């Protein structure tokens, strides 16, 4: 199955969390937390403005992003892989190399 996001939605695959602290301690359970970084897998066509025009998204497929997993974020499992469906507003930054 393949997802195609609508409008200003973005599909992101969350990066794996580092399971060791900076001091080398292995983190488990809630201490490990969930990553707020991921790679953009798919983007919608853009946000519909009040005048009916469409504003293209700033993020693109392949971007590594930092996101806020807030109220509007939806987690789905597609082909045994967990992905997040976010709006572009949930994305806080694009990580540039």
Curated annotation (Swiss-Prot):
InterPro entries linked: Chaperonin_GroES, Chaperonin_GroES_sf, Chaprnonin_Cpn10_CS, GroES-like_sf
Domain of life: Bacteria
Matching PROSITE patterns: CHAPERONINS_CPN10
Chief place where the protein resides: cytoplasm
Keyword tags: Chaperone, Cytoplasm
Disulfide pattern: none
GO cellular component: cytoplasm
GO terms of molecular function: ATP binding; metal ion binding; protein folding chaperone; protein-folding chaperone binding; unfolded protein binding
Pfam families: Cpn10 (PF00166)
GO biological process: chaperone cofactor-dependent protein refolding
Cell location: Cytoplasm
Family per similarity comment: Belongs to the GroES chaperonin family.
Oligomeric form and interacting partners: Heptamer of 7 subunits arranged in a ring. Interacts with the chaperonin GroEL.
Function: Together with the chaperonin GroEL, plays an essential role in assisting protein folding. The GroEL-GroES system forms a nano-cage that allows encapsulation of the non-native substrate proteins and provides a physical environment optimized to promote and accelerate protein folding. GroES binds to the apical surface of the GroEL ring, thereby capping the opening of the GroEL channel.
The protein's name in its UniProt record: Co-chaperonin GroES
Organism: Buchnera aphidicola subsp. Cinara cedri (strain Cc)
């Amino acid at each position: 199955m393949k997802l195609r996001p609508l409008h200003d939605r973005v599909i992101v695959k969350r990066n794996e969390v580092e399971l060791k602290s900076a001091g080398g301690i292995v983190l488990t359970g809630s201490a490990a937390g969930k990553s707020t970084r991921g790679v953009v897998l798919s983007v919608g066509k853009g946000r519909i403005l009040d005048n009916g025009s469409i504003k293209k998204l700033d993020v693109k497929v392949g971007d590594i992003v930092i996101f806020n997993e807030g109220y509007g974020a939806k987690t789905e499992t597609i082909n045994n892989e967990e992905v997040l469906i976010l709006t572009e507003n949930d994305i806080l930054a694009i990580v540039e190399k």
